């Protein structure tokens, strides 16, 4: 039996053959040429894809952007997620993703992990007939341009329901620690792809904090990047302030067009580990580490100012580990001295750092989340958003 262009996908209790088709529209090409000199035009028609069923209303979270085809969403940042609700016993997930690890959850319980699923349809069958919530989440960091989520579909006869909604929003800006790189690992010395394979962004301090407050979130975080200086001075002059402007981490010319619906009440910044982990290298623009520290503090204060312009009513949480806590404390002090009142400083202490390459492990992430949650709770009126609304379609302001 030939299975050209098809694959057996097992999700739930049923396996089916599918043909990878990302667009449902019928494609018809008309070729106006003569057959054997007769002058009769020939119509060439590509076979229509099978009926995909009913497209569900989707709640897209994380830094995901609408795709070229209605119903599609493109994503590249870790933690991006898509949610929908329906009444029935079956649902299909349309994807084109060759880089990500993704988790499929039904009613809050993980049903399937998809590692680099490629292009096609993941079919879920055999659910108990009734109302369900499906969630698809990117749980790792990947290094391609972007992937595409093509929607959730249910068969005819099932009932679409309104997508989940939330009223709270938190934005996290950071590095590999923020996205939870290798947090599942139980050892510091890792080999090959282990550091990526042992990652689950759902268990990062960012996702844990958002879950505690039942908040939507964006995780804008990249490994080896710093606020002003990347690990060992790599990829200069780009730094996390540069990448923050992007719709996808590795697409330099695609600026993130921020939707009016995204106006986080809390912004958590966790940048400094890569800035200070390794001493200055030849060719870097600072005379010594003292000069770099001063530049880091200046740049951090300016970055908060840029973010404040986007979210006038947001509450900022600045976090640090031992290696750069004094510098972030100085940022916090300067912001307060300038009249900034909606800001907190959180110093992470007592971390075991037992995951790959001394990254925080799952226990550390739980502790870090608890510290951030305590700071937010202590602020009192964080969720009472103030200030002017964000302009529809606004972009992230560039650094000077």
Spans of features found by a protein language model:
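N-terminal secretory signal peptides that target proteins for export/translocation
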Residues: 1-22
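N-terminal secretory targeting modules
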Residues: 8, 13, 31-32, 39-201, ...
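Sec-dependent signal peptide recognition
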Residues: 23-30
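Conserved SGNH/GDSL esterase-like catalytic core that processes O-acyl groups on lipids
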Residues: 77-80, 119, 142-146, 188-289, ...
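Alpha-helical cap/lid subdomain in secreted, periplasmic
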Residues: 107, 241-386
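A structural signal for isolated positions on well-ordered beta-strands in alpha/beta enzyme cores
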Residues: 135, 171, 218, 315-317
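Conserved beta-strand scaffold positions in the cores of enzyme catalytic domains, especially
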Residues: 172, 217-219, 345-347
